[in-house]
Amino acid sequence: MDYVSDDFAPSNILSCNDDSGDHPRNLIPELCRQFYANGWVTGTGGGISIKYNDQIFIAPSGVQKERIQPDDLFVQNLNGEDVIIPKPEKKLSKSQCTPIFMCSFTERNAGAVIHVHSQEVVKLCLLNPENEVKITGLEMIKGIYNEKKGKFYDNDEELIIPIIENSKYEKDLVDTFKIALKKYPSTSAVLVRNHGMYVWGSNWKTPKTQLEGYEYLFKIAIFKKIPPV
């Protein structure tokens, strides 16, 4: 295991001195700033992980997401073993979401996973005592990927997103998360009641755009459920 060096190239396993905006070292901090501006990762909440060259880049836990720097990230292999960690003086810890991230990578072959503490998700779950949310008839459904069919939904199809119950610790969500993945093979997201949402895709662009689509759909779903004053 190595520490991050000043040029972000601490080993010959993976060159991290890539200036490309799409490199996880640069991309994760940028996306976290965008998500913070949208109100999805405030108060140190939320997280993101991206697979790159068979290695997993993970944002740190318990930090202000809008202030994450490229050398704050953790890198581990597909077996969950740390390969590169931030320098000790930073006193950072790996995201508590890591077990769910890894579950998405192994169970769904995801390329990226995003976790947000969206107020819209929490509101929608409060309005839905059931263990799923059903949405129909909206154009933005076409922006959501059906993992079972391997294509995006049509706007006349029913979109079903599972809800699992929250737990004291993120790692304790893994079992119910796996059950939801098996029960809902079409889903690209899981809602956690009173908590937030996990969304994933084959690359970083897919969960980002789907997250935006889900937020839109959830706002409309909430509007339809709340009776007019």
Curated annotation (Swiss-Prot):
One of its GO terms (cellular component) is cytoplasm. This is Probable methylthioribulose-1-phosphate dehydratase. Keywords: Amino-acid biosynthesis, Cytoplasm, Lyase, Metal-binding, Methionine biosynthesis, Zinc. Its cofactor is Zn(2+). Its EC number is 4.2.1.109. Catalyzes the dehydration of methylthioribulose-1-phosphate (MTRu-1-P) into 2,3-diketo-5-methylthiopentyl-1-phosphate (DK-MTP-1-P). It catalyses: 5-(methylsulfanyl)-D-ribulose 1-phosphate = 5-methylsulfanyl-2,3-dioxopentyl phosphate + H2O. Zn(2+) binds at H115, H117, H195. GO terms for molecular function: methylthioribulose 1-phosphate dehydratase activity; zinc ion binding. The keyword Membrane does not apply. InterPro entries: Aldolase_II/adducin_N, Aldolase_II/adducin_N_sf, MethylthioRu-1-P_deHdtase_MtnB, Salvage_MtnB_euk. Signal peptide: none annotated. Coiled coil: none annotated. It comes from Acyrthosiphon pisum.
